[in-house]
UniProtKB/Swiss-Prot annotation:
GO BP of this protein: defense response to fungus; killing of cells of another organism
Organism domain of life: Eukaryota
Tagged with keyword Heme: no
Lineage: Eukaryota, Viridiplantae, Streptophyta, Embryophyta, Tracheophyta
Location relative to the cell: Secreted
Name of this protein: Putative defensin-like protein 36
Disulfide bonds: C33-C59, C45-C69, C49-C71
Keyword line: Antimicrobial, Disulfide bond, Fungicide, Plant defense, Secreted, Signal
Coiled-coil residue windows: none
GO cellular component: extracellular region
Family: Belongs to the DEFL family.
Transmembrane helix recorded as keyword: no
Primary localization class, coarse: secreted
Amino acid sequence: MASNKVSFFLVLCLCILLAGECIESPIFTGNKCSDPTGMDKDGKCLDYCHAQGYPGGSCIGFIDQGYMCVCKVG
């Protein structure tokens, strides 16, 4: 009975670790977006993220900082 609990716990931990790999994590670059409305019309944020090796990026609004470039992972 104890070995079943240990096996269940190990499988549960493995599932949690694998699920964490699939979640997109944003990478905050600290670069302000040039467009005050938050649109990446000129593609600078996307180009920056591609140059850094990330698959994508976009401008996301923050209350205290305005729109910032955020790269996507995964």
